[in-house]
Design a protein with these regions (language model features):
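Auxiliary Fe-S-binding modules of radical SAM enzymes
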Residues: 51-156
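Conserved non-cysteine loop/helix-boundary elements of the Radical SAM core domain that shape
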Residues: 1-25, 35-56, 76-90
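Short, catalytically relevant binding-site loops at active-site mouths
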Residues: 34-39, 67-71
Length: 156
């Protein structure tokens, strides 16, 4: 996902630079964009990210959900058939997979307008509660109602 989204760095770069921050006793946070891996790949991306995050010590992992606007490059990629957006329930499942696979001591939050829900907790202590909450939402959510929120989100 990092290469496709033209981020200009690899997971190994993140690991190297964050270890330098830790060696200098500088705290840092991570930002996780739920949905960036695309349809059918969210849980793979979540597990790969958790594997990287588990090697480090971020203070906070903040997650937001991808919202695609018609003026974005990603929208053009969708129009060309090069990328497909995750559904809203799939985004919730991706967030659940991220939390399930994190083993480090950190805070996790979902703040910002792009999030359908607010999740806040301290891992690993709140993992079971957060996963249970997400499982309930995944089982009971209405994709069309969730999508309605996303398409009416004018700005972030």
């Amino acid at each position: 996902a990092l290469a496709f989204m033209n981020k200009g760095f690899r997971a190994s770069d993140v690991l190297e630079q964050c270890r330098k921050l830790e060696a200098a006793d500088i705290s840092y946070n991570f930002f996780y964009l739920t949905g960036i891996s695309g349809a059918g790949r969210g849980e793979i991306g979540a597990k790969a990210s958790a594997e990287l995050f588990n090697q480090l010590h971020p203070q906070i992992i903040e997650s937001s959900m991808l919202t695609i606007y018609k003026t974005s490059e990603l929208y053009q990629e969708i129009q060309r058939g090069n990328w497909k957006e995750e559904g809203e329930i799939e985004k919730l499942a991706e967030l659940k997979a991220l939390i399930e696979n994190l083993t480090i001591d950190t805070r996790i939050v979902t703040d910002g307008a792009s999030n359908l829900i607010q999740v806040r907790g301290h891992l690993p202590a709140d993992k079971e509660k957060l996963v249970g909450y997400l499982e309930h939402l995944i089982e009971t959510a209405d994709e069309a109602a969730l999508r309605e929120y996303r398409v009416n989100l004018r700005h972030l």
